[in-house]
Amino acid sequence: INRLSLMLEQNNVLIGENAWGKSSLLDALTLLLSPESELYHFERDDFWFPPGDINGREHHLHIILTFRESLPGRHRVRRYRPLEACWTPCTDGYHRIFYRLEGESAEDGSVMTLRSFLDKDGHPIDVEDINDQARHLVRLMPVLRLRDARFMRRIRNGTVPNVPNVEVTARQLDFLARELSSHPQNLSDGQIRQGLSAMVQLLEHYFSEQGAGQARYRLMRRRASNEQRSWRYLDIINRMIDRPGGRSYRVILLGLFATLLQAKGTLRLDKDARPLLLIEDPETRLHPIMLSVAWHLLNLLPLQRIATTNSGELLSLTPVEHVCRLVRESSRVAAWRLGPSGLSTEDSRRISFHIRFNRPSSLFARCWLLVEGETETWVINELARQCGHHFDAEGIKVIEFAQSGLKPLVKFARRMGIEWHVLVDGDEAGKKYAATVRSLLNNDREAEREHLTALPALDMEHFMYRQGFSDVFHRVAQIPENVPMNLRKVISKAIHRSSKPDLAIEVAMEAGRRGVDSVPTLLKKMFSRVLWLARGRAD
C-alpha cells in the first residue's frame, strides 16, 4: 500500500481485487494493535516499494490511527482515564485520539520507529511517557484477527497460558443455556445445549489458528447426532439474542468469546478491552446456510468489525452501507463506500432489492452496463461474446434498470467507485432515460460519449430488424419476406409467436452464425467504450 485513507464504521465489509493490499492492511493493524506486551517496531520489509522495483523502496512510512469516542463525553469514563492527556476535542463535538507511527529507514538497513499523539491540527501533543500511553491504548483497543494460519505462524510465540479457562467456558455456556431456557421459544433444554454446542464449534472454526499449537482444547465437542439440527437450533438462539432486550445475552456471548479465545492460545485480554475484530474471508470452508448462521452470530458480538470477503453470498447478508470497495489506483488505494449520508430510504430499498438480494456479485464488478430490460441483457451478452469479449473476465456486469429505476443505480455506482455506461431505446421512455443520464453528467458532451449510447430505433427489436436481421423476424413470425407488411406488425407477430427474450436469443445466435461483421457498428463501439472504462478501473 502506497497511500490509503480508510474511514471505518462499526461494521465494515471490505471487498476488492486481489492486488488492493488486503494482507498489508490487516498485517499493519494486527502488528500495531496486537495485544502482546511489546509495542511493534517497524522492519525494513514494512516499507513500500514500486511494483517490480525493490531498489526503489521508500525510507519513510507514516500511519495515523484515529480513535473516536462512541458518544460525546464517553472519553471521561473510568476505562479511558489513563489516556486523559491524549484526547483531542474536535469541531463535531466528539473527542478523538490521533495516534501516529512513523518509520525511518537508514542506508545501513537500520530502522527507527517513532510514536506520537497529535492534536486536531496534526501537531504532536506533549505527553509524558508516549510508549506507556501507546501500550495502554493497545491494551484497551487490541486487534483480534480470526483465522489466517500464515499470519498466526508469523507472530506466534509459542507460550501457552498456565490455566486454560475451559471450565469457565463450560460455566458460561451453562449460564447462557439457563438464561435462554427461561425464554424458550419452543426449544427444549437439550435443543438449546445442542445449539450452543454448534456455537462453540463455529467459534472454534474461526479461532483454529489463534494461538499456540499445543493449546488445541476441544470444548464441548460431543458431536451432535444430527449436525444440521444443531445449526438450526443455533439460528433460533441467534434470533433470540438479537431481539430487543437481548443485551444481557450479548454480554454473556462476549464473555464466552473472550474465554474461548484465551483457552485457545497465547492471548490475555485486559478486562476493559474492546477488541477490533478482523475476520478474513469468513466464507472459507462453510456451506452458504452455515455461513448465514455464522455471520449472524459474529454480528451479535458487540464489537467493531472489519471483514474481508470474495463471497457474493456474504454480501447478500450485508447492508450495502457496510460495504467498502478498495480499488488500486496509480498513486494510492482508493476506498469507496456510501458513507454516513448514504442514500435516501427509497433508493436504499431499491438498491437492496435489485443489487444486494438479486445480484450481490455485481458489487465486485469494475463497470456496469445498464440496459432497459431482459431483451437487451440477452442480446448484449451474446453479441459481446460473438465479438470475443468476455465480460465476466473483464469485470463488466450487464444490469437491467427498468425495475429499479436508472437514477438510484447510477448514483450508487458512482458512490461505490464502479464505472457505468447506459444503453437506452429511441422511444419516449428511452429519451427520458437519456435526459436523466445527461442531467447526472451536467450536460457534459465529452462525458456523455463515455456514459451513454442511444439506439436510433424504437427498441432493440426495431434496431436489429433494420441492421440486416429482418429475415429472422419473418422466420419466427412465419411470414414470407415478400409479403407486404410493415415492420412493426412483423416484429409484433414474431414476439407473439415466441417471446421477447427468445426472439433476442434467436437474433444473437444468427449473428454468431454470420460472424463478427454482422454485429452492428454502434454496439461494437459501445463494447469498446465499456471495456475501456472497465480496464481503467483494473489494477
Locate each region found by the language model.
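Charge-patterned, long linear interaction tracts outside catalytic cores
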Residues: 225-231, 380, 385, 474-539
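RecA-like P-loop NTPase motor core
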Residues: 315-316, 321-429
